[in-house]
Amino acid sequence: MQRTGKSRRALVRHQTWAVALDAAKVRFEDGWHEVKTGAVFWVEAATGKQGVGEQGQAGRIQAREQSYIAEVGSMEEAGARLYAEVIERGVDPAEQVLVCLADGAPGIWSQYALHFPHRVEVLDWYHAMEHLWAAGNGVLGESTEPAKQWVAAQEQLLWDGHVEEVIANLATLAEAPKGEAAREQIHYFDVNRERMRYPQLRAKGYPIGSGLVESACKRVVGARLKQAGMCWTKTGAQSVLALRTARLSNRWQQAWLATAALPLAA
């Protein structure tokens, strides 16, 4: 049954909506540049026990009705395009809370702050773990048993919401020989600590992993623009990405109807 605009808006207001933004490198005529890729989706909670980490949460938080954007221009242009996609989905950022996922890049947080006043910022769990592994492996040895044990302990602390204890443990590890690898990670966890309150986020049914947009970088950008020998102009890449995102967002027919409605050149 087709929903009316009014009933659709009412449904959207009661759903938990999220956005994620990331980037993938593509070869252009003047070298390699980032193509920013974003995803807009709502999340559905299911019952079931969680394990530790993003994979443990996957059993109870699932992304639904994903749509995508891609931008070869600046981060500011990507932010504007993501905002337009949120509006297209019927979400009003001026009224509705949006869960905003990112890997910690300052430019992404800035765009979220600009466009989504009622946001909940979430640092992607997988990237947080990558930074813990960088510290553990760098100080205690690549994939050694001490490194594995140290990272496992920090993972449990982070999962349970003790980010300040993780920062303190990084500071302790930084005093060891080769401690620079841990020292480099302290700032990352410090500036993102409020985005890493994972127990509270999970309790509200919010996603903590940006795996969807990581996958989007491969599906939207990589699978189409990074085949062997490909080299793009920015205009050509943006045109192809417009078609690619329309298809993957289930708006292919809509995109062609809009094109057909354009006036013919004289």
Question: In which residue ranges do the predicted regions lie?
Answer:
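Catalytic center-proximal scaffold of phosphoryl-transfer enzymes
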Residues: 1-266
